[in-house]
C-alpha cells in the first residue's frame, strides 16, 4: 500500500497474484538497503524466531517478526498493529469475548482431548458473539494459540519427568551475536527446555514439543533450525534431542550440530533479515524523528 499507493486485490487468484508479483518484482530487484544509526544499542531476536526470520516457519513470517520488533523498539513510529494487539483489541471489546479470553488464559488440561473440547467451545461462543468475520478469525487464532501454548508449558515438566534419561533444568538465557549495523548489535537470545547429562559427563540439549493433533514422526525444517540455533548458542555441546509427545505417545530424534549449515544457510539468511529490518527502520524512524524535530523547531520559531 505505501509503496504502490494502492491495495492489491483478489489475493490467491492465480492471475491476480501473478500480476501483483510482476509489479513487486522490479521494486525488490532494485531495492537497496539504507543503513543509518537508529539510536538502539541492541536488538534481540528470540531463538524460537530464527526459523521465521529465514522464511522457513509456516506460522511465523518475517514481516510479522519485523512488525513485533518495530513495536518493541520504536512503538511511536509503527503504524501497523501486531497480530496479538489486533486480537487483544477484539477480545477485550466486549464483556462476553473478554470472558472467553480469561477462561482460555486460566484453563488447565492433562490431555489434548480436553484442550480440543475447550477450543471447540470457545469457537462456538465466538461465532455467536456478534463479532465481524475478520475479528472472529483474529480472536479464534489467538485463543487457539493461547490454549496450545499453555498446554505445552504446563505439560513440559511431565514430559521431562517421563523421559528415561537424566534431565536437568537450565534457566540460563544464552545469547549469540549475529551482526552489528551502524552501532546496533543484533543478537539471538533463548533458553533451552532441558539438558540431558550422560554418565561420562557430556551433555545433550533436549527440546520438548507437546503435539496437539498427533506425532509428526519427523523433524520439521523450522524445528531443526531452532535446534541448530541452540547448538550454536550453548558451548561445548554437539547434539540436540528433540522429543515430541502426544498424550501417551512419544518419539525422539537426535540432531547433530551442523556448523556448515549454520554458516552457509541459516546465518546468512538471519543477517539478511537484520539488514532488512535495520534498513526499514533507517528509512522510517529517522524520517519520523526528523519530521518531529522540524515541527518542534517550527513551533518554537512561531512562539519566539
Give a label for each model feature.
Residues 34-162, 296-304:
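Charged, glycine-rich intrinsically disordered N-terminal tails and low-complexity linkers that flank
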Residues 1-36:
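Acidic, Mg2+-coordinating catalytic module of metal-dependent nucleases/exonucleases
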Residues 286-300:
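Non-catalytic accessory segments flanking enzymatic or RNA/DNA-binding domains
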Residues 9-13, 147-151, 155, 218-219:
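Conserved aromatic-histidine-acidic binding/catalytic patches
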Residues 158, 166-290:
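Nucleic-acid nuclease catalytic cores
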